[in-house]
Amino acid sequence: MASLKLTLGVFAIALVGVWVPAPASAQNSPYVIAASDAASALPGATVTANDVDESITTIKKRVDEVNVLFIATDRHGKFVRNLNQTDFSIFDDHKPVESILNFRRETDLPIELGLLMDVSGSVQGRFGFEKDAATGFLQHIIRPGYDRAFVVGFNKESRVTQDFTDKMPLLAAGVQRLNNGGGTALYDAIYKACKDKLLHDQFDHPVRKAIVILSDGEDNQSETTRAQAIEMAQRAEVLIYAISTDDSGLILRGDKVLEDLASATGGRAFFPYKMKDITRSFAAIEDELRSQYDVAYKPSGFDADGRYHSIEITALKKDLQVRARRGYYAPRQ
């Protein structure tokens, strides 16, 4: 198979500071149901982030350095964990980058995670099981003293039921306080979570930021557009993972929305049909968050123009697939 070329993306921000190696991984106890292979993702449409809020503040550190986390898999979908810097090339706005400044595998980087659960009336069928599975996921992935998470329930409005914490009893209580009913403002929830919780430069060490969404993807209340939600996630360097709550077995409009949100930010969407597949989806997300690579590079002829820039990563190994963000927004000076 010819080498694969994917258009990906990152937000222009350097991960700087001293990283202290993590303690041993959290307990290996299973979730509600033992984890196995994740459900397959659906192909999604591409959305261009235009006409967005120009008042958004871009985080600036070293302006000429771009940093991206990415996943590599083989043709069977299994993670490839032995890549070298010579196994891929990077293009920024279709031009070869000037230099690669850093490349390493990130397995224990601290996680800052947002759990966003759709509590609208359309998702009530499996809501109780989903809350239990989400609680199991948080218990398994959050390492006290190292990782943190927050919990948000959204219908026509978003409500934080538990702010950032590493304490599992508080997170579990935050999930159990969620009650469903009402319309759905998915894009507003993503935008607000990224802007209020994950955008600001509040971390004094490298972290990986992610949002896990449980929803059917049907938005009927948001003032924010999908493009604006995607841009805010890209500016905040947030990976979006989505687990569909639709159990019809059909490919619906909401499924394509979830796929697009995930692929635009370097995450992944899952479409579990059976309840046990929800648990498997959570397990796959955890595995992926522990199987990423981090590369930092200097673009050729970098210009702090505030524009959106695309990234292309060309895998040089046969049958290798790479997944990351579609693009980033340069700082403006």
Question: Where are the regions that the model predicts?
Answer:
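Positively charged n-region of N-terminal signal peptides that target proteins for export
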Residues: 1-6
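Sec/Tat signal peptide C-region and signal peptidase I cleavage site
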Residues: 19-26
